[in-house]
Amino acid sequence: MRQVRNGVFETNSSSVHSICIQKDKNITLPNSIYFYTDEYGWEFDCVNTASYLYTLILNSGDKEEKLNTLKNILDKHNISYTFEEYKTGYVDHGCEAADFVEAVLNDEDLLLRCLFGAASCVYTGNDNKAEKNNMCFCADETIWDGEKCRLVSNPNHKPDKYDYFYKGN
């Protein structure tokens, strides 16, 4: 989140995640999928979309309903699934990604592209090091250019190739 105070951009220094779902509908559905939980916070990484979604669901208030929706869609496509028993795992400020969870569970095509699209992934990172090449910002159309002291077009934002969801805070 960017705020302007006294004419200067400031951030609240937290995790930033760009959820990138390939738009190409040419995907191969597997016979099975494995879901595990993990810790998704400030680290710069490209992480597994299925396990990111599963971790978000397990940390939500109505996890049983959401898991049943997920299972029903996978059953419809004859995809077997294994869910690792929850021991630990979180998404930093995961409630900020509630719109992503709702969107994929209410749109079968979007969910399947999210889980099985070869180019789909979640880029994690943080806003403490706002460099143009940090992929955690790719869901943003613009990015702060410290050298030019202004927002510029984000070279990593490719709306023709991806549906994006942004988890800030």
Residue ranges and their predicted role:
Residues 1-10, 15-169:
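Long, non-globular targeting/processing and low-complexity regions
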